[in-house]
Structure formats: C-alpha cells, structure tokens
Amino acid sequence: MYRWLSLALLFAVVIVVPAQAGGISGQYIEARTCDVWTGPCFANADMSLDGKHAVLAWKVDQGALDNVRLDGLAVVAIVSASDTLGLEQTGPAKSVLIVDSRASAAQRAALIGLAKRQAGDLVGKVVAIQNSKIEFEASTCTDGGCARLEAGKARIETRCLDGHHDKVCGNESAFYPPLSKDVKAQAAVAIEHSFAGTAFNETWKDSQRRGAYVGSFEIR
C-alpha cells in the first residue's frame, strides 16, 4: 500500500511542476504608423499606404519561458513590413530585436524566443539583434492607456483615447487588432512613436496618432 501511495505522490508532482513553470505574464505596448482606432472609410483610404512600421514591446512581470526566469526583463521588436500591418502581406517583414541588457545569455535566448512566439511572422526575418537598456513604464491613468517605452533608438509614449475629442468620423472602433498574440489591450493615442536606428536603412517619426495599444499579455 505504501508503495502505491508513493507512486501516486510522485505522479502528482510530475504533472503539477511543469504547469507552474510554464506561466508567464507582463505588460505589452505597440505603436504603428497608421490609426488602429478608426472608422472603415479612413482605414480603407490608408491601406497599403500607411501602417507598414511598428514597435512592439513585452515586459515580463513574472514567469518563465523554457524554464528560464524572466521576471522584470523586456524585449522589443521593431518591424518594417511590405504592406499595412494587419493585412495580408505580399512579402516577408523585416525586424530588429532589442533585448534587455540586464539579461544573462540564457535569458537573452528566452526573450528572443518570447518575441518570436508572440509576434510570429512579423519577426520571421530578423536583420539585427541588439542589447540595450529598456525602460517600459505603464502609469495608472484613468483609462489605463498611458505608457512610455525607450529602447535604444525606439521610443513610444501614449495617452488614453478621449472618446469625444479624438473622434473624427464618429464610428471609430478598434479596426486593427493588436499585432501580438495572447494580449489584452486597449487602443491609445501615440503621442510619440519613433525609430531612429540604421538596421533598415529607413527611420520614422510619428506623433498624435490613434495608433497604439497598451495592455498586458499572459501565456499559460
């Protein structure tokens, strides 16, 4: 009888431990060079013209990926696509990954894996991987849309949408969903969204656009 109890306890440990090691959650932000909170008429007019560039960032509050703890660390993906992001692409997107400079070698590899898992094909063609200090702060403003990101040559600063002041056509909604998987986020205004690096041979600087998302991510 004692033998069967021991086996049962061993089996219970085996099935519980991986579940605890696999969870990861944190904060998420993205900004694009087109409005994501917009009306269909404006979105249709911008398709294939704007929205080909974006900055995405994940900051881990707690958890592990591939059995590597990532608490407090962040990773950023800077994306340049051939077509408006959120639409079918005619060619592969290019990306630059910026990894938290505090990460160890194992954590660096796990953070790169996190970005690739969450962004999928958007980071399928990585042209550069850089280490940098990453500052990612989400403030406690009324509607939760205020955040700031600085990572190398990439910067995002957002504010909450004002349902009255920020309307143009009157039937705005979150026309384009977030680019990352496993996120809960709300649209926000990008006060500033810029990338001044050299990896793409192109830079961008955008401001006061309804083109951001601020929220959280969770992988179970």
PLM feature segments, named:
Residues 98-217:
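Mature, soluble, non-transmembrane domains
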Residues 1-4:
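Positively charged n-region of N-terminal signal peptides that target proteins for export
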Residues 16-22:
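Sec/Tat signal peptide C-region and signal peptidase I cleavage site
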Residues 22-99:
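N-terminal Sec/ER secretory leader and immediately downstream segment
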Residues 6-16:
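Bacterial N-terminal signal peptides
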